[in-house]
From Swiss-Prot:
The keyword DNA damage does not apply. InterPro entries: Cyt_b/b6_C, Cyt_b/b6_N, Cytb/b6-like_sf, Cytochrome_b_N_euk/bac, Di-haem_cyt_TM. It comes from Lepus arcticus. Heme b b562 binds at H83, H182. Binds 2 heme b groups non-covalently. The lineage of its organism: Eukaryota, Metazoa, Chordata, Craniata, Vertebrata. Belongs to the cytochrome b family. It comes from the Eukaryota. It is a multi-pass membrane protein. The gene is MT-CYB. The cytochrome bc1 complex contains 11 subunits: 3 respiratory subunits (MT-CYB, CYC1 and UQCRFS1), 2 core proteins (UQCRC1 and UQCRC2) and 6 low-molecular weight proteins (UQCRH/QCR6, UQCRB/QCR7, UQCRQ/QCR8, UQCR10/QCR9, UQCR11/QCR10 and a cleavage product of UQCRFS1). This cytochrome bc1 complex then forms a dimer. This is Cytochrome b. GO terms for biological process: mitochondrial electron transport, ubiquinol to cytochrome c. A ubiquinone binds at H201. Keywords: Electron transport, Heme, Iron, Membrane, Metal-binding, Mitochondrion, Mitochondrion inner membrane, Respiratory chain, Transmembrane, Transmembrane helix, Transport, Ubiquinone.
């Protein structure tokens, strides 16, 4: 009987992406950050979903709802700190991943690299909007300063800033739309990650020696699945 993972229409895609994928035999720990970013994204989406159940995007109650999460919700403090520190870990992995790409010349894979740049900007935008949500003093300052940068655009700058704010200052409308975008963007990022991987698997990954590895490839599983799991544990 033929193995179901090689014949089933859906499992076949997973098989070609994560199991039987031919991968260079010499990629180092620098190639672990892609899978770590995937783990970070999953943690952020899961913890964010639970936080969104208790958060209120209203200027009068936003800060109180964050306090309520930390004090009254079962393990709410843990979920919040996982989400906040998970975001920091996300960026550490992101900068390492980009740094490795620059050092080892991954920018030659144009489609993969360009989607990666879009992903970087999308993650930065998501993080910025998340920073505003607790509606403390620094949230208000951050929202005002960063959005005000757009006012430097000639002619349309002021109108653009007021359009983003939803009024003449950072207020309830700003907080509500920032929460809406902060909620939806991670799912858009997840979709972009799929496209990023699609383009990567079209060309194959590069390797530390910088030479074509077509003549020396090994299956992704079990070699790199175990390597990635070790990265998760570390």
């Amino acid at each position: 009987m033929t193995n179901i993972r090689k014949t089933h229409p859906l499992l076949k895609i997973v098989n070609h992406s994560l199991i039987d994928l031919p991968a260079p035999s010499n990629i180092s720990a620098w190639w672990n950050f892609g899978s770590l970013l995937g783990l970070c994204l999953m943690i952020q989406i899961l913890t964010g979903l639970f936080l969104a159940m208790h958060y209120t995007s209203d200027t009068a109650t936003a800060f109180s709802s964050v306090t309520h999460i930390c004090r009254d919700v079962n393990y709410g403090w843990l979920i919040r700190y996982l989400h906040a520190n998970g975001a920091s870990m996300f960026f550490i992995c992101l900068y390492m991943h980009v740094g490795r790409g620059i050092y080892y010349g991954s920018y030659t894979y144009l489609e993969t690299w360009n989607i990666g740049i879009i992903l970087l900007f999308a993650v930065m935008a998501t993080a910025f909007m998340g920073y505003v949500l607790p509606w403390g003093q620094m949230s208000f300052w951050g929202a005002t300063v960063i959005t005000n940068l757009l006012s430097a655009i000639p002619y349309i700058g002021t109108t653009l800033v007021e359009w983003i704010w939803g009024g003449f200052s950072v207020d309830k409308a700003t907080l509500t739309r920032f929460f809406a975008f902060h909620f939806i963007l991670p799912f858009i990022i997840a979709a972009l990650v799929m496209i990023h991987l699609l383009f990567l698997h079209e060309t194959g990954s590069n390797n530390p020696s910088g030479i074509p590895s077509d003549s020396d490839k090994i299956p992704f599983h079990p070699y790199y699945t175990i390597k990635d799991l070790l990265g998760f544990l570390v």
